[in-house]
Every structure is written in structure tokens, then in C-alpha cells.
């Protein structure tokens, strides 16, 4: 039986008010709050202001990552939420971002990432070797 | 006529030698070199070591981002390369990572991100307002 290691939601947001996505501090605030909305665990966050327009940012999570890249001159933002563990957390984080930016149109896709055969289990020999067992 | 703002390659790598993806310093080296292979422009890079196994990391690019999350106990790594501009750079960066990790199987998908109607052009009024023109 297969199981998946992660859930990845990608969303392209169109018709966004450009003033909401132009500044690094605004997308930082947006993504930090999405982490709270999803009850996710932040490791670190990193943002960058482009000149003259747009910003980019990522939050590394214990559960994987959230990223955003913005083109305010096109009223467009691309957002990724990739989490392992409880899938509802990814949906809650993405919903927070979409609701906050109120795009006129969203192109959203959802993928399972890392599909493994549960029957094969873990690489026990390697794990034991790392633990100094063999 | 439509044009796309970015190209996103996602790849799940299976059957990877776990010793190649267990340590933060190894995936840092891998991703930093993929940036060079793709002739991409690094803004900043961020990595984290999980305990007991696996690591996570992202490089913010002027062109968007590269990320990796690893599960050495499952011989699995998930990799994203998302770039705007010349699409060949994304392929070269991803090819570098895949060739370096030599997985037995790869599940790879490619997406256009941010598809805009070129005929609509940019939001000129907003751009002018930001430039203090109106």
C-alpha cells in the first residue's frame, strides 16, 4: 500500500490589488500569518524586495515550505504551500493567503509529493548504520 | 496572446543513496552548485538539519526559487525549481540535481506559472502611480 510524504498546493492568483503584493513587508506579514492560520511550524523566513516592483519570499517549515513570488504590475502572485503531515494545514494556509489577496481568478493544483510503498518500509539497515548499530 | 511569467519543474526522486541526502551541508552544496549549473542568480540560501534524519533547504533566486526536502530513510527527495526568464536555466539546474543524486526513478512534472494575457499589457496606471506620475 502506498503512502505520501507530502502535499503540495500550487496556486497562481490573478487580478490581485497590486498594492497588496508590491512590498516585501506586506508579503512577509501575509506569509507569517498563513503559517499561524495553518498551525504550521516555522523554521525561518526570508524575503526580498525587487526594484521597481514586486517581492519574493519563502518560509522554511518543519513541514516543508511556503513560497510567494509577485508581479504587481501584472496583478499576479504565484504561491506554493508544501507540507508533510496533516494535509488540512496546507489547505488552511493556502486559503488564508487567497482570502487575504482576494484575486479575481485562481488557478490551483494539488499534488501528492513523495509517494512511497508502505510495504517496503524504511531502509532499516541504513537507519541502524546511522545509529551506530552496524 | 498569452505569455507565462515562470516555469516550475517539480521532481520526486526515489531510490537515492541516503548518504547523499541526509546532511544539511551536502544538500547545501548540491543546491548551490545547481544554481551555478543553471547560471541563475542567488539572492540567499537557507538550510536546516532534521534530527535524526533528513534536511530541508531553499535558495531564493532573482528568478524565483529552488527547494529540496529529503527523507533519507525512504531514499526520497522532493525538488522544486521555479524560474522566470530563460526556461533552459530551470532545466539545467534540475538536471544537475537529478544527475548528482542518481535516483533509480524520477517523477517529474513541468508547469507554466503565471499565465497572463500579453494583449492586456501591464497595469500602466498603477505603475505610473508608483512612479509618482499620477
From Swiss-Prot, chains A, B:
Q: In which pathway does it act?
A: Amine and polyamine biosynthesis; S-adenosylmethioninamine biosynthesis; S-adenosylmethioninamine from S-adenosyl-L-methionine: step 1/1
Q: What is its EC number?
A: 4.1.1.50
Listed cofactors = pyruvate
Q: How is the cofactor bound?
A: Binds 1 pyruvoyl group covalently per subunit.
Q: Which GO terms describe its cellular component?
A: cytosol
Could you tell me which residues carry Pyruvic acid (Ser)? 64
| Domain of life, source organism | Bacteria
Its post-translational modification remark reads: Is synthesized initially as an inactive proenzyme. Formation of the active enzyme involves a self-maturation process in which the active site pyruvoyl group is generated from an internal serine residue via an autocatalytic post-translational modification. Two non-identical subunits are generated from the proenzyme in this reaction, and the pyruvate is formed at the N-terminus of the alpha chain, which is derived from the carboxyl end of the proenzyme.
Classification via SUPFAM superfamilies? S-adenosylmethionine decarboxylase
Which Gene3D superfamilies does the protein's record reference? Answer: S-adenosylmethionine decarboxylase
Tell me which UniProt keywords the record has, alphabetically. Autocatalytic cleavage, Decarboxylase, Lyase, Polyamine biosynthesis, Pyruvate, S-adenosyl-L-methionine, Schiff base, Spermidine biosynthesis, Zymogen
Where is the site described as Cleavage (non-hydrolytic) found in this chain?
63-64
Active site (record annotation): 64, 69, 84
What's the top EC group for this one? Answer: lyase
Gene Ontology MF terms in the entry: adenosylmethionine decarboxylase activity
Which GO annotations describe the biological process of this protein?
spermidine biosynthetic process
Catalyses:
S-adenosyl-L-methionine + H(+) = S-adenosyl 3-(methylsulfanyl)propylamine + CO2
UniProt-listed NCBIfam families: SAM_DCase_Bsu (TIGR03330)
**In which family does this protein belong, per the annotation?**
Belongs to the prokaryotic AdoMetDC family. Type 1 subfamily.
What role does this protein play? Answer: Catalyzes the decarboxylation of S-adenosylmethionine to S-adenosylmethioninamine (dcAdoMet), the propylamine donor required for the synthesis of the polyamines spermine and spermidine from the diamine putrescine.
Q: How does it assemble?
A: Heterotetramer of two alpha and two beta chains arranged as a dimer of alpha/beta heterodimers.
Protein name, please?
A: S-adenosylmethionine decarboxylase proenzyme
What lineage is on file? Bacteria, Pseudomonadati, Aquificota, Aquificia, Aquificales
